[in-house]
């Protein structure tokens, strides 16, 4: 099944690309979610008429993500947690805890945007945490974990 992408899809393509996908993926996921339209002649013509509008929307989303990244790069978060004598936490600090701490600091961050490549944080100390705001925009936040 051929579809025209209405937004960037990881490992598939970017806005306006005509790609071939399995019929179930296109019919059950991409089209109902508004991420693509079937590549018929009518849809191709309609997409070309809306291309400038869609590219403008994508540019606005990118600009908003860059503005949020500038705010996040200036923020340092301190999280207190129970820890043993050697700095090992009783439990862990995960994406939800970091997102909640950033929200309490006045910034809106979804837990899905927080990237912890090595899993949850289990020790006290300072950590640089990546916040993926857009596929092209990643902010770095310094998170300090101290024991109670």
From Swiss-Prot:
Molecular functions per Gene Ontology: rRNA binding; structural constituent of ribosome
| InterPro entries, alphabetized | Ribosomal_bL9, Ribosomal_bL9/RNase_H1_N, Ribosomal_bL9_bac/chp, Ribosomal_bL9_C, Ribosomal_bL9_C_sf, Ribosomal_bL9_N, Ribosomal_bL9_N_sf
One of the record's GO cellular component terms: ribosome
Entry keyword set: Ribonucleoprotein, Ribosomal protein, RNA-binding, rRNA-binding
Q: Where is the signal peptide?
A: none
One BP annotation, GO: translation
**SUPFAM superfamilies linked to this entry:** L9 N-domain-like, Ribosomal protein L9 C-domain
What exactly does this protein do? Binds to the 23S rRNA.
PANTHER family, A to Z: 50S RIBOSOMAL PROTEIN L9 (PTHR21368)
Q: Identify its protein family.
A: Belongs to the bacterial ribosomal protein bL9 family.
Q: What is this protein called?
A: Large ribosomal subunit protein bL9
In the UniProt record, the gene name given for this protein reads: rplI
């Amino acid at each position: 099944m051929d579809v025209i992408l209405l937004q960037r899809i990881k490992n598939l393509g970017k806005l306006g690309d005509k790609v071939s996908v399995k019929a179930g993926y296109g019919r059950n996921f991409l089209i109902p979610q508004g991420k693509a339209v079937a590549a018929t002649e009518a849809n191709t013509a309609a997409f070309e008429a809306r291309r400038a509008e869609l590219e403008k929307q994508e540019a606005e989303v990118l600009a908003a993500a860059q503005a949020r990244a500038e705010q996040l790069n200036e923020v340092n978060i301190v999280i207190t947690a129970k820890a043993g004598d050697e700095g090992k936490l009783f439990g862990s600090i995960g994406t939800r805890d970091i997102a909640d701490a950033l929200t309490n600091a006045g910034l809106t961050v979804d837990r899905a945007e927080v990237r912890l490549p090595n899993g949850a944080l289990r020790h006290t100390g300072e950590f640089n945490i990546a916040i993926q705001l857009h596929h092209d925009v990643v902010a770095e936040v310094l998170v300090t974990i101290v024991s109670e």
